[in-house]
């Protein structure tokens, strides 16, 4: 009976040790992936200066109003603000500016025009409720645009690195507990 218990204990310890090592390896791989994808995007972002934006005007540009230019197939919200002592065009995120420089906000659902228009009107109403809000600007003097939020800000970075850190800590604790259990069982066997 005693030999079977020792064998089962060793098998369980081996499995727990393998689980701990697997957790540490997965955390290392996740750190590598995040370090090569999210971290460079965070470091590349120039939108670092936080300021207070004052709403000047908003306008919903429709397909008819954009004649002669590349016409988007969705309603376009254009927001003009005063930030850091100058007039600026507000963009929802950095990607919004890259997708269409004429639009401050691009609706999520572009399949249905009426749903997209309702979404744009809802966002416009929120701007009228809050005339002052925080925005991010680039430190360059001649920059005439600001963003409402960064895609890869400090919160996203913290949340992205939380789970691999949790996995790494759990794996290391599991390995430490197995090693402690082995050393305590050796000490108990010597007595």
Curated annotation (Swiss-Prot):
Protein name: Calcium-activated potassium channel subunit beta-1
Topology, Extracellular side: 40-155
Post-translational modification: N-glycosylated.
Transmembrane in keyword set: yes
Keywords per UniProt: Glycoprotein, Ion channel, Ion transport, Membrane, Transmembrane, Transmembrane helix, Transport
Record field: transmembrane: 19-39, 156-176
InterPro entries named among the record's database cross-references: K_chnl_Ca-activ_BK_bsu
Localization, UniProt: Membrane
